[in-house]
Amino acid sequence: MSQRQQAATKKKPQRTCLGCREVRNKNELVRIVRTPEGEVIVDARGRANGRGAYICSNAECLRKAVRTKALERALKVEIPEAIIESLARDIEQ
């Protein structure tokens, strides 16, 4: 198999949205990270250090992930309401 064929058949990483539980390509989802310092942020580039979780880029999936506490379980941290509102604003942008 040539290098060109390998590049064409290369698999893209798949991740599951915490809100709707739909499996999508990693680059279609938004990564939320708990940094080593304990801060919860939206990782736009997908390269921040820390424990990550993925959701679709819509507010409904974030609401569902928060309501079911899936986001807190995935990040292993309690998330204050102020941070959730900040995440919602970041995702909408």
Regions found by a protein language model. Give the residues of each.
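C-terminal structural segments of small proteins and small subunits
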Residues: 63-93
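A short beta-strand motif that forms part of the nucleic acid-binding face
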Residues: 34-36, 46, 60
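Short linker/helix segments within small regulatory modules
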Residues: 38-50
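Short functional micro-motifs and their immediate structural scaffolds
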Residues: 25-28, 61, 66
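Processing junctions and N-termini across compartments
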Residues: 11-14, 50, 55
